[in-house]
């Protein structure tokens, strides 16, 4: 019998978020790992890789409504959660994998650079732990649970298979089907440039002072639509590799990427139930 994995779960929507509950419940159904939740006590969306540099941050053991091995709430950002988990809670025995999400809303395209969900995954990678960030387009209610346990299991073991000679992770986005159609499958793609968030919306102005909201999102597309965006529009789950080399996000060469796409398909087809996934 293979050993059970030790997985750290975090997010940026907060420890009580529906997306975290969905991630936990589907991992429990897959039953291949012991789960530890270390997540912000309040919503921390848009925090990217920020951490509490100028003020103290606290961590508190909490009761979680699902059967996890342990749960802690952190008074800080998603990166704070990963730093405290790896630097304190699991200092002597790192988790095998860090899973972040499931985010309420897309983190495809440009959103990845602002995302606290992706920021937590990147922090784990920088610390030497493979990681995956999960996000659901539009609204968390679009998340489909029928095939999710097997999908999460396969992606977890793929991240642990060392597809690159460096510690790696993935940014996974689930499409939103207005007609609730089943996901068509998975596609490993490069990061697109669509889906910009943070557009200024004027709330009030008194002549001297203006007040804005930066929570508006607008899909920005060129005529040359990215493969990531096209796949999501076609109801495919997108899997984008995150690599740490000399910069926070480093893309491979075209030939390396094509090779990665081939190995991704081979790995997923090696055990995957083709009735569930078209990879």
Curated annotation (Swiss-Prot):
- Binding, a divalent metal cation: 12-13, 45, 103
Any one GO CC term of this protein is: cytoplasm
Q: Which UniProt keywords apply?
A: Cytoplasm, Hydrolase, Metal-binding, Nucleotide-binding
The UniProt record lists the EC number as 3.1.3.5
Q: Where are the transmembrane segments?
A: none
Record GO terms (molecular function): 3'-nucleotidase activity; 5'-nucleotidase activity; exopolyphosphatase activity; metal ion binding; nucleotide binding
Task: Quote the subcellular location field of this record.
Answer: Cytoplasm
**What remark does the entry make about the cofactor?**
Binds 1 divalent metal cation per subunit.
What's the catalysed reaction?
a ribonucleoside 5'-phosphate + H2O = a ribonucleoside + phosphate
Q: Could you tell me which SUPFAM superfamilies the record lists for this protein?
A: SurE-like (SSF64167)
* A Pfam short name: SurE
What PANTHER family does the annotation carry? 5'-NUCLEOTIDASE SURE, 5'_3'-NUCLEOTIDASE SURE
Instruction: Tell me the protein family, please.
Output: Belongs to the SurE nucleotidase family.
Question: So what does this one do?
Answer: Nucleotidase that shows phosphatase activity on nucleoside 5'-monophosphates.
User: Would you tell me the protein name for this molecule?
Assistant: 5'-nucleotidase SurE 1
Species: Chlamydia caviae (strain ATCC VR-813 / DSM 19441 / 03DC25 / GPIC)
* Encoding gene, per UniProt annotation: surE1
């Amino acid at each position: 019998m293979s050993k059970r994995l030790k997985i750290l779960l975090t997010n940026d929507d907060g420890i009580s978020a529906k997306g975290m509950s969905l991630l936990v419940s589907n991992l429990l159904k897959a039953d291949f790992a012991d789960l530890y939740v270390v997540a912000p006590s309040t919503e921390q969306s848009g925090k990217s890789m920020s951490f509490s540099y100028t003020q103290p941050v606290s961590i508190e053991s909490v009761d979680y409504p699902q059967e996890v091995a342990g749960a802690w709430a952190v008074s800080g950002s998603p990166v704070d959660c990963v730093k405290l988990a790896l630097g304190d809670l699991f200092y002597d025995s790192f988790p095998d994998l860090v899973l972040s999400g499931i985010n309420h809303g897309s983190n495809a395209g440009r959103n990845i650079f602002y995302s606290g969900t992706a920021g937590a995954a990147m922090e784990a990678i920088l610390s030497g732990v493979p990681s995956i960030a999960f996000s659901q387009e539009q609204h968390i209610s679009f998340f489909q649970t029928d095939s999710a346990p097997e999908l999460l299991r396969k992606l977890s073991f793929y991240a642990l298979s060392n597809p690159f000679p460096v510690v790696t992770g993935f940014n996974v986005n689930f499409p939103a089907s207005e007609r609730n159609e089943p996901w068509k499958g998975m596609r490993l793609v490069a990061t697109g440039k669509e889906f910009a968030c943070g557009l200024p919306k004027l709330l009030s102005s008194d002549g001297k002072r203006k007040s804005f909201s930066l929570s508006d999102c607008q899909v920005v597309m060129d005529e040359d639509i990215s493969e990531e965006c096209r796949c999501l529009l076609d109801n495919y789950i997108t899997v984008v590799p995150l690599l740490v080399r000399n910069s926070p996000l480093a893309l491979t060469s075209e030939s390396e990427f094509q090779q990665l796409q081939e190995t991704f398909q081979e790995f997923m087809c090696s055990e995957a139930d083709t009735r569930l996934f078209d990879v």
